[in-house]
Structure formats: C-alpha cells, structure tokens
From Swiss-Prot:
Family statement: Belongs to the bacterial ribosomal protein bL33 family.
Taxonomic superkingdom: Bacteria
Organism: Fusobacterium nucleatum subsp. nucleatum (strain ATCC 25586 / DSM 15643 / BCRC 10681 / CIP 101130 / JCM 8532 / KCTC 2640 / LMG 13131 / VPI 4355)
Keywords: Ribonucleoprotein, Ribosomal protein
Transmembrane feature ranges: none
Record-linked InterPro entries: Ribosomal_bL33 (IPR001705), Ribosomal_bL33_sf (IPR038584), Ribosomal_zn-bd (IPR011332)
GO biological process: translation
Name of protein: Large ribosomal subunit protein bL33
Disulfide bonds: none
GO molecular function: structural constituent of ribosome
Length: 50
C-alpha cells in the first residue's frame, strides 16, 4: 500500500516536497537530501505527519 508523505526541512522547517512510499516494505520514517530554495543548498528532509 503506497501512501503520500510530506517532507520537512530540518533547518528551515519548510514543507514543500511530497513523495510516496510503501509502508509495508519501509515502515521507518523517510529521510533524504533535497534542495532547499531558501538556503540555496541541499539539506536533510525528514518525513512528517500530516
């Protein structure tokens, strides 16, 4: 079952990325490096609750 998740920046708390994940195969929280347009660099984004 794929669900949509929101990613939040750990530095600026921006939430402007969404993605999907399979909860059955990846039950842990998602973390990935994404580009932050405010800081103009890549930062760590973590999965948040809606």
């Amino acid at each position: 079952m794929r669900v949509q998740v929101i990613l939040e920046c750990t530095e600026t708390k921006l939430r402007h990325y969404t993605t999907t994940k399979n909860k059955k195969t990846h039950p842990e929280r998602l973390e990935m490096m994404k580009y932050n347009p405010v800081l103009k660099k890549h930062t760590l984004y973590k999965e948040t609750k809606k």
